[in-house]
Amino acid sequence: MQNPVLSMTGNLMWTRSGVVWATWRLQGMPYGFAADATKQLARLQHQALFQGLRGEAVLLGLCASLDPVQVAERMLAGVEIGGRPEWAQEVALTLDGLADVPVGERTFWLTAPLAGTHAKHRARAAAHAVESELRDILALPRRVPSADEVAEAGIIARRVEEAIPGAFAPVRATPAELVWMAQHAQLRGLALDSEAPLPGSDGRRALDVSAGHARGTDERDRIVAGAAFAEPLLDEGGQSDLAPRSLDRFTPFRRRFLKVHSPCSDEASYQVLLALTGSPRGGWVVPGVEWIAKVDEFDFPVDWAVRLQVTSGQAVKRRNKSAENTLRDQITQQSVDGETSIIDNGGHLGDVAESLQSYADALGRSDKEVEVQATTILAIGASNPDDARTLAKHVQQTYQLAEFVFDAPLGGQEQLWWAMHPGAPTERLVRELAQITTGREFASAVPLVSTDLGDGAGLHLADNITSGRHGPVFLDLEGTIQANRSASIGLVAELGAGKSYTMKKIAGDLIDRGGRVFIIDRTEAREYAKFAGSLLPDQTALVDLMHPTASLDPLRIFGVREGARHVQSLFSAMLGVRPRDELGVELARLLSPENVATLGVTSLGSLRAVLAGSEPGSNGARLHGLMSMVAEKDLGRVLFDDSLPPLDLRARAIIPLTAGLPLPSEHELDNKHLFDELSLEKIFGRAMYAFLTGLARQICFSTAQFTMFCADECHHITTSPEGQAHVLDFLRDGRKHNAVAVLASHDPHDFGDVRARGLIPIRIVMRHTDPELAERALDWLERGIASDARILTELTENVSPAGTDGRVAPDRQGEALLRDARQRIGKVRIVAPKRSERREMISTTPVGPDGEALA
């Protein structure tokens, strides 16, 4: 067979058979880790797709390679790289690391011949094909379709497009994409495949039909000759590889493959085409055996195509009525004395009758039901025949475990290969291999499901390991905000699973890309102080509250006018000076602009000095006593020591260290008598956490620069009403101020109430071996999936699992379940920074005396 395409424009192609075909690129639906309700919706969308089609159609799932250069370009998108040498180095190292690692994605396509509503349309298309053949014979230039022909085809294609459910987001294919599909088939298995062209930004505008004419609105409307497709040399069984007298020529059963030699490559592709010839007699269990989607579980590319012939249920019922009458006659003729014979194959008629009745019942469930005749083809390629057959054998054996039989028909490899091409007519072998079912039943195969995660560009957060086809997962927090969506992140994991590592990975990349971060570090090991060593030293500010080298005095870091407001809030929580009490009113008077200027107040230390001269028993004296209670302790240095330089709010990374600062327990906060007896240290700690969270809010909400607030072990903040209120502000209003919050804890309930938990769109759940905590984490990840035993087992047993030695293998560290901003869920592995100094600084694994990691 020759290349079937004569010419094309937009998503339309005119073929040698006289039929015009149209092709759309489809978007897969999330499925693998979705809740049962979401899976049911996906099956219903597939059912609507099959029930909306009529006649012939082809569904394609092709594995597209992803060029490492494109990964680098996505990481650079939106970054002024000239002033970001650290990010440029990270991208360069990422590019080097991807050079030998195959990454890719699966692309989905629907292509269908356009059956004209009038005989003249079909006659015109046939005449065009005959004329093209004659011109080829006479060596004359081919005639391109006229504007009227394009317009007519566009109208018919629009009807097909309207039948495609919007959930699959159909976009009209371009000639570039159609050429890529043909080239991909010729280079299958050679690792030479180029990435699939990006779909147009407005694919639905490929044809602008007005007054019966097609107007070229962009490059996609240009008529492209079929010569754009390279003509391959097809050699079934690789006969050209055999010596003239080789005995292998007489053993064709051992050579069930197709050798494809493309003009685009000096190397031939060896491909095995498998066709579905048998399925479980009793059907398959759904969810659980979505058999077409199973191809993504292989760690090598497997393309698939489904040739469909869809017939309305009413037409099938009329046909089956005739079959029923014939079957009744056969049963009557084979009956003896009114009893059906079971000898000489007569007994099988009862099985036929039962099958016919079951099929009729299935068709009668809905007036929209259709009959689907589907020929399913899998294509596996390699650079040599042995590898191709080995991979194909693995596919066959894997499917055979579920009672699905795939065979490589002898002598039919070339026909199956062409059957996977848009525009190629259906040949006899393909029709003979069709499996007959209903639209509802075939929808349970859910072929159009995607494992895509993350954003189109941004920082490289993780590798997608949901399926055997690994690909990069990008996180574009700024882009998400610009799309008017929240970009806050929640991290949940048990101890040592990697939530702190992930938080530091995100924060470090954000700083390298030009953003700002505010991180509260409460760890005794001061791990974020260590992490700060990998950041820009002149733009990083560390504030150790217990051993301060910088002051957090609000009057000094904000200025007296703005700082006065923060002082009143701080003293309310720390000293019990309520704004409307006598002491609160006195404090407000002292910090008024007039008195501040008169008294020379520039800091809390100077304010305390002014109050030192107050009359005994006065409100000023009482304020001085309360302030001295804190100022004279080591706790108070960070607020009252004027010898310390004030915190520089211009720093790109601000990291307060709160290790050693105790906090009241939730029980103490809930019981008044316990709260009244709190130690000074706990009162101070509670007030400072609330102040730090407010400080973070002030910094993040007062700049146009993209800023991130990070709270590891966030229960230290959310246990207090003040801290919880500030966190809720971040989650509610961060988007408006170009800011996000990143919260981490062992339990999602630590993020706050149901409102706070629900306002976190990007959710990451790492290893949780405790079933109860794992269920809570999964219920937060997506309501409903906690009851799925398969997903619960996946989280507790197969996310960064420990080996027999109690250690997690290096290649299994950092695994997690991720729900992205588009609410798609999949399994990922967090990638480590490529720069060695950053990688060392964000690790929290203890090391022994020999320098080796202890865990």
Label each PLM-derived region with a short phrase.
Residues 36-54, 315, 418-472, 522, ...:
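P-loop NTPase motor domains
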Residues 60-77, 88, 98-99, 501-596:
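Switch/coupling segment of Walker-type NTPase motor domains
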Residues 489, 563-606, 752-855:
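P-loop NTPase motor core of the ASCE superfamily
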Residues 471, 477-497, 501-509, 518-527, ...:
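Conserved P-loop NTPase motor cores
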Residues 1-17:
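N-terminal basic/disordered segments at the start of proteins
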Residues 27-67, 75-76, 84, 155:
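N-terminal pre-first-transmembrane
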Residues 1-4, 20, 37-47, 53-55, ...:
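An aromatic-glycine-centered, glycine-rich loop/turn in mixed alpha/beta architecture
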Residues 76-81, 280-368:
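Surface-exposed, low-hydrophobicity interaction/linker segments
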